[in-house]
Amino acid sequence: MFSFFKQIFKSLKKFFFLLFGIIFVLFSIIFLETSILQLSNNLVNTYTALVQKTNSSDIVAPAIFKESSPVYKTELKEEKRHFSKIKLTEKKINFIWPYQESDFGSDSEKKDSTTKSSDNNPRKGDVNDKDKLFLARKRGILKAYGEANIAEKRIYKGLAVSFQNTYSFTGTDQESNNLNQNTVSDPQNLIYDKEGNLLGYFVDGLILDGIPLRAGIARFPGDKGKGEDKKTTKKKSEIKQASSATTVLQPLAAQAKMTDAKETTNNEEPKKDSNVEEQYTTNNKDKVWFKSDETQAGSSSGESETSKLSTSYLFTGGQEAANWFPNLYANVPIVLPISPGSQFWLETNPFKEIIEVFQKEKEEKEKQSFSLTFTLDTSKLSHLDKEEFDWLEKQAETISSGSSFGDYNLKKKINSLKSFELNINKDWLKNKVKAEKETILDSLPGFSNSDKNTIFSTQSGDAKSGTQSNPSSLIALRSSVSFKPQLQQTNVALAQQQQDKQESSADDGVKDPTFSDVQTEFDKIGTENHTPQKNLNNVYAALLHQWKSIFQEDLVKKVTALLEKYRDAFLKAKALKELEFSRQNLAIATNVSSEESASFLVSNKDSQKYNDLSIIEGINFKSWLAKEKSNPLDMVYGGKSNSEGFLEKVEYEFKPTQTDEKKKAAAKTTQGTTDSLTQLADASSSSSSSSTGDTKSTSTKFQIYPKLANILAQAQLPEASSIPDTLTNAIKQWSTLDKKGFEALDDTGKSKAANNYVALLSYFTPEFQDPNELVVTNRQKLDIPIIFKNGVNPLTLPTDQQSLVVQTPEAHGAVVSQQWLFKHDKEVLPLEGEYSWKEALENPKNLPNWLNDLPDKYKFSINGLTFAILGVGESVETGYPVLSTNSPLPNSQDEGLIFLNEQGYRSVLFAVPAASEENYYAFKSDDIKAKFPGQDPIQVVASKLKGYLNVPDSDLAFNVKDISKFQYLTTARNYFPDLVQNYLAIASVVIAAFLSILALYLTILLIKSFIKKNQTEFSIIRAGGFSTAKFIAGMSVFAGIVALASSFFGVLFAFLLERQVKGIISRYWFIALPANSFNWISFFGSMLLIFVIFQFISWIAFKQLFSKPVNVLIDQGNETKFSVFLHLLKRKSYTMTPLGKFRVSLIISRLSRLFTYVGLSSIALLLIGIAGTIPQKFGAAQSNTVLNRNFNYRLNLQTPTEQSGWYAIQPYSRFGQTDDSLGIKALYKDKGDQIQQQQQQQQQQGNDKEHPYNLKELKISDRGGNPIKHNGKEIELGNLLLPSFGGAQQLNTDENFFRHASLSKWLIDFPIRVGGANINPWEIVEKSIPKQITQLLSASSDQFLIAVLTDDYFNNLNNNGFLTRNPRTNFIQLDAARVLTQINVFNPGGVKFNEQFLKFLTKVYGDPELSYQDSKLTYGIVPVDPQIEETYTYVQGPFGFKETELNPDSPYTLTGISPDSKFVNLTDSGGNSLRSLISSDSEMNVIVNAGFQYANNTKIGDFIFIQPKNTATRYSEKFLKSPPKTPTVKFRVVGVSTDAFGQELYINQNIANRLLKLNGFDGRGVIKDVVKDGQSTDDSGGTSSGGGSCGGGSTSSTTKDKYKIEYVKPTGYVPFNGVFSKELNPSLVSKALVLNSNIGVWGNFTDFGNNFTNLVKGKENKIITSILPSDPDILKQLAKEKGENGVDSMTYENLRKKVIEKYTSEWSSTQSLASGARGIFGDNIMVPALKLDAAGASAQIIRNNAEVLFNTVNQVDGFLLGTIIPFIFITCVVLGISMLEEMKRIFISLKSIGYKDSQNLVSLLCFFIPAFVLSLLISIAILAGLLVGVQALVFGVAQVFLTNVFEFLPYMVGIVLFGATIFVIGSYFWIKLRSAELKEGF
């Protein structure tokens, strides 16, 4: 046995190469199979485990519903009953709001009052001695409504609230001589239903659930009646009041007038002013006086208590003086909210008494009324809506009682939506027509100016009197500015006086409406070919019809909102009540505020039944919201108690609500302009409040307020020891109320809870505000600060805390995907320490600072929202986070996957309004099968949802991995992981099979060779009695070495190279894979398997060997056999030499080994070809594209219209600067000293409506103060919008206010204190801006301000505090007190930036780098810097290769480039320039790129056809009844460029402009202005033209002004609609947000409603001039359609004049103009110039896809080069050497008979070289076919064209490698042959 083992080890030396070869082969097999199979198993196991762990669903139903479209049937009826205005004692319309005192709030001095309490007096509490708390609350409430400064010891009583008794339905009265407008409310506009319930306030045809009021501080006499005898009391009761209740109603500019002491005598009341006509009392019968405790009440001289008022005190008391000017500081607008039928809302309303008066003291008159009855046509509802509406009706009471304060009166709400009746008093209707004749007739179609006089002159009565001024226009009279105290006549008195005068006058020509006549006209409206009669009945009917339309629209919106609100609840209760499901919410949000990622896939992981979130690292999701310690402010800051989690607490209470901007616009009241700062504040506030009132549901109010009260009740109140016991009891009550529910209380308890709630809320915040404003969604918190939109100075709470913040810090936590975390070098928050999440939750008040201080590696942001990284997680439904069907390959560099809770998810939607949401219902088939055994779960779900979802029946429900539903991205995200698993499994099986066969073959070869080599020795040993078993045992040494070495190193390398193997699929697999340890199972398993197989093969080999006798085996030991082919070659017929025959036979004698060697060599060469060719193809595609395209982005813009004119251009760093040569006219005038003095005088009179800025003070300078020049001229910020009172007025009066203006948010987004209120100019401007634009501006504005403050120079300049940073929110904004001029309340023109800040501002914008960082909104100016940007013109429309077969949905566009373009270098494959082929402006040539040629098999000489659709005349053509057919244009393909990304077609830019009608005649250019004919605004001498000049003939006797369009054609300017940019972050995408006006009117309006009609009133001809076509061909056809003769012979100017005259007559009123414009332009008025949906589509998406593919190819390339190729080459060497060992005897024999060693070496090469050549040919053929497949695959997936041209360079590398292999084999052979002894050959 020992000798046998010795022979074994002796043989190992001879078989070293073969042994090494088999060890290496087995090592490679184990390494590859362990890596791939382990990876494949990991994929399957982790995916399966994740499905189980997260309870993942496998069936989805897209939550897509048909948009609700309720229909109302309307009928006009006659009604005898009418609820009129509120009935007021003695026609008094003033109220005092007594404090709605709670159980713990009352004025202790009230106990001593001798005044008898009435039912309306304040309620008394049980702790009247707690004055301190009550005073705090009282002061807070008063301060919220405008008190500038309140002394502790002064006594206050209440708030004066006023209605003005006018006949104005619009809420506006206007006086023609001074254009004073004052927002008011009319008691007559209160609307009641047929049962007499108050519905709301009627204004502009809408019922608002808020009543606009005027309010001010009302004060009682200091002694409150103490010591007064009855006589005195009686005498005083007869006094005509001169109090705040009157003065609060005066406009700002009117001086507060008081009675001087000299005008009074002892024991006498102040003398009456002659203008005072009425005694004003409050609803509790108390007189209202001004009174300060500092004044002497009743002196020894016997003077009255008011006689000692010092006039000097009025102006010397600093802020205290403001207390004597309530009209300045207390006359603020408020909105009285109404919630019909809601007792709770009434109880919690501070204005309860007023509401009760409105409700109880209304008048019911038996007068004729017009009744508009609206009935919901349920038969017209969709199947879903009808069933849901019926369900809501049945479940209304259950829903109301079960939703806490949800929809407290849902049943009543539904009934009012089913049937609604609006009664309109005929007197009311008449009064409206009488008071607003001009306005009404302007709004009615078909009425000309001449009709206005005709209609009223033909009626009964005096026509002349019918034209008298609106009585309400006399309400606000002004006196000259004077500091002399005197008493002015009150507005209300004037109104009443004028009304009485009017009632006593003769009929003014407006006859009473007769129901039958009006009904007849009403029924005719809308009928075909109806021509309105020019009479009053038709006016009445038209007015009623307008109201009908408005109310119908309003009711439809309310029904739609109700149905959408309860949709999920209905489906859960009805269609899906037997099924378990969860709502799946995903959103794709584009991020612009950070460079971390461009887009995020945001998943809402809040309490889902299915598809939970699995946490890999970090905080476990289930304990995400947990706290270890109890905190007094837990609920204030959204923490978690022991029993309830935050998610349950917020359920829906804190969900942000997104206001419908269209509703706001519809409900917006007319904003009047005044010359008063207070009125400016009032107008903006009233408009906002009124508009939002219509959009809020009752449920929102109930959701927020009680929850907020509960939160406040659980808060740790300051100075607890000083808080009354009753307050503590109230807190306890609210702490338990949430558990018991409001409904569990009796009526007394409800009232008590409501009152305590009001007082509690008032304790913390003085302003009882609108519920929706409580939620600051883009800051993730409920913020209850002291300062609000109309607030004043902060009220200091006992703890000096300026505000109370209710936050949800959990919403600032996010879980991210593992790939995104690694890609961006982020980390998960540590579990302990200052940066731990636990620290953030335990100290929530410091959360903003904590987030700000958090290192960047622990956080990220989306549009300004900051999120801390709590952990790494995953979920099945986002397993492959594809974001778009256009970009199916996720790119973790630019795209991220995050998981948020409900609040975080909603906040992202708010911060990214353009985010696209995907909502699904998720089901699990196993759960469905359990309830519906034997049925297909998908069909079960589909049958339940049929008729409800707005999708095809086949899409009602489907398997989540059904890739045929690829339009639903959720299928792609779920299908692709399976696809990767399957591909990897297939690859692993194929590789395993191939390698296993190869390994088995080599093992057999090794064993057979070993046995054959030692056959003689083994035969002798066998003859000595050795058994086969002992031979097998001896071979175990051989097997053990092979098994141990190959297994150990194979598993070890698999462990070490795990990350590299995973990297191959890392771009396609996003579910985290566990990190593997050394795989001992694989090690022992593979070692045992190899050992057993080795031994088994050895057993078979020895069995076969010893089947022959031993003597035979010994004799055969030295026998050398030649194949039969060698014997055949011995025939004489073959003339080959013996050596030649030997060499041929050598090749074919071992066919199996030949095939093996050729196969391995072919694979090796093929892999070399792939590794060297495919990456080179990608590199060539990229380099060719870069060579042709010298830009990173191509940005398509909206084609400018004829009406808008060409885009103006300017480098972004110069935005805001005036440049007349470019058509950018200054907003401000360069006023001389004399003019400036006149301006100042006008400002003092309050009549200046111009910007107060002078261009001289807006000249920019460098840091040294030196003026900066451009083209030799000093640069001015003449186009940067700066805040001013004149600018605010122009906003509502200038129809071209925004033309070529630039707006920087930071310069207008700050609170300006005006008249006791804070107004924010940005809030006014943003109403005319699309919401997504405002969000983008907000997201990037802070970055610029941070850059300014981090610059040392500007930070030092800011020492005076221009910019302030809020330490709590880190928000930076301007400080109005530091940047504005001293506001003179009598001089509105004084509101402007002061000189010091303007210097700071001009230096900031004088720094090019800083100026470039600022984010600006601009109107009609596109950033084009020739250094980094270039323009182009693209043409799109139906496209095809045959004129008769055009595809209207074709994705192809023609890109028109300049022949001298520096950004597009068109070259062919030979490097030759192709641009000259499209340099001609007349030849219709096109150059296509390689991608287009490949996709369409296009050849040079082919033709393409297109019908341009994005023309500049696309809206102009809509003026025509029969628009001309767009001609089809033919282009000839003249060249193919080598750029390989996407599919491109290039033409000459001038030709493109001609096709789009952007050039060609004088009527086009950059529109500088629209001016009166004969007038020019060209002050600079720049090139301008009046090609658009026109006349405006009028059909009326009054000649209207004629206007012309002033064009500028800048030198070298070429029209365009696209921009190439070299920037990686183009300013046009990230900084410059460009809006363009399709209509050519640049005013503050977003639709053609009231804003538009008010803005253009009196300017109709100018507007018509702007919006009419300018194209000659269109004008000719339009003139012919209008019946004009001689059109063909007219000049262009005359032709346009005629057309304008026609439209001036046709659109004679603002209403007809608005209607006509709406029919042409629709809602496309002010639109973003950049087509956001296609921004960079051909660059960014393709670049992302290419990057993923390139990286994957490189990973595969590295894997091939590093593992498989070396393995194959070593295997080939081993095989060669093994074959050499077998043939060694033959060659020694040949040597012995005289053949040289060189001849024998050549004989050996005759085997290897043909084998290599054959391998080379096979691999080349396979690679050629593979290249074609890869080319098609890559182009289909990523739109990247790869050439399939064969590259021989990689094969040269292969030839060298094989040469080295042959050299190694040959060297080994040569050495062996030279050292061999001849006896070895025998």
From Swiss-Prot:
Residues 221-239, 259-275, 284-294, 500-511 have a biased composition (Basic and acidic residues). Residues 1583-1594 have a biased composition (Gly residues). It is a multi-pass membrane protein. The keyword Metal-binding does not apply. Residues 103-129, 220-306, 492-513, 658-698, 1233-1253, 1572-1598 are annotated as: Disordered. Residues 667-698, 1234-1245 have a biased composition (Low complexity). One of its GO terms (cellular component) is plasma membrane. Keywords: Cell membrane, Membrane, Transmembrane, Transmembrane helix, Transport. InterPro entries: ABC3_permease_C (IPR003838). The chain crosses the membrane at residues 16-36, 987-1007, 1037-1057, 1080-1100, 1154-1174, 1759-1779, 1807-1827, 1828-1848, 1851-1871. It is found in: Cell membrane. It comes from the Bacteria. Belongs to the ABC-4 integral membrane protein family. This is Uncharacterized ABC transporter permease MG468 homolog. It comes from Mycoplasma pneumoniae (strain ATCC 29342 / M129 / Subtype 1).
